[in-house]
Amino acid sequence: MRYTHILIETRFDEPNSVVSHMTEDVTLAVGGIAPEFEAFLSDGSKFVLSEALSSGKGVILYFYPRDNTPGCTSQACDFRDNFGRISDGSWKVVGVSTDSAKSHQNFISKHELPFDLIVDEEAELHSLYGTWREKSMYGKTYMGTVRSTFAISSDGTLAWVGYKVKTKG
């Protein structure tokens, strides 16, 4: 199941109050406009896509299933190991998973990650970007994260889109 359009209403005076409305299927594509969003980082600060892009740098937004699992750790460490090359250019790296802020903080500390992680426990941002989809394992279906990466240019357009990306590990 893929989601095309999500309206997210969040009251910042009540951080856990989120209402989302999902409609038809769609997958984001290169050349399209990246969906605008506001979300909380693991340190409790707010990340606003348009504000991040206003710095003149693009944003590499990557979605991964779970902190401290082999594939996700490999992916995060690959971004870490290439961070100087990426961030010295024109990009800011931001990871997203449905893990808690505490889990993210431990993950960042344990692997010395030099970039921010967004807390998306209810998968609203995942749904907005089409990365929260029906999956199956051993004959059972469930909703989960499809490992995906989006390179968002400073003008807000999608310069690169990768669904079902593979990790080195």
Where are the predicted features?
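Chalcogenol-based redox active-site neighborhoods
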Residues: 3, 12, 18-169
